[in-house]
């Protein structure tokens, strides 16, 4: 747990959350990396070696049941972690379909490129089949512009 304090301090400099929430998120992220899974039961085993895994599991459940992540806060955190201050970045927007069990999710994702990989900042589930329309794409793009501006934007990439 030597990484816990630097991680929650870093997160605290970007997220306006209480210390217990920052500590939980830090534990959760470390467990996620250590366990290489998103399964809460398995994550609870890697959460705190001195705590009962059922207690850790209930802690995970309570956090996600009672706390609402602000999409803009998470996007700001990700952006501040990967964008070079004063540097340029490429924006990518794409519509894709993911399967969640038997359910097909039609997603519109907007992200920035980091070391050749697009990191999604905003993702919307489109309540329809097929492509997004211009207004949906403009709405996502405007969210990014509202908190980053356009100064460092080198390129905007979209298909079609």
Where are the language model's segments positioned?
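Conserved, well-structured functional cores that handle cations and Mg-NTP chemistry
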Residues: 1-160
